[in-house]
Amino acid sequence: MVVPSRVVVVAAPKLVGTGPIQSVAELADYPWLQEIGTNEATRYLEQNGVTKGIRKGLISLPGNLMIDAARDGQGVATLARAFIEADIAAGRLRVLFADDERAGYFLVTPEGVLRPAAKAFAQWVMRQAAAGLGAGY
């Protein structure tokens, strides 16, 4: 695993406030953000009993825009904590729920010897990860 990270449900305090949120169902009145090509938000809602969907809709965005939209208070998002640790520490995002499952990102390469450029890239990725990207796990 290159970057270990729990999946967290987050939102900007200006969207959900600072008070306690006891269940995922309480978030059904907010728009939810989901990365294009994934089903993490939909799956999280279903796993937590919110099967009828959300009243303000599910907005699909590219990953970088999803994080920006969450910071801006445009919706609730399920994200890898490692990529938003600074936002959490600064108070721009609030962790509402955290998944207990250990998850993360892997670097997958084909079997056999890597070409020099691919090997250099893989080594760079590993150095970047070792420099602290996964420190928020």
Task: Tell me what each language-model feature is.
Residues 104-105, 124:
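Short alpha-helical linear motifs
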Residues 113-127, 133:
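Short amphipathic alpha-helical coupling segments at ligand-binding clamshell hinges
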Residues 1-74, 82-104, 130-137:
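C-terminal regulatory
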Residues 43, 61, 111-112, 117:
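Short leucine-rich amphipathic alpha-helices used at interfaces
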Residues 11, 109-111:
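Short beta-strand-to-loop capping motifs
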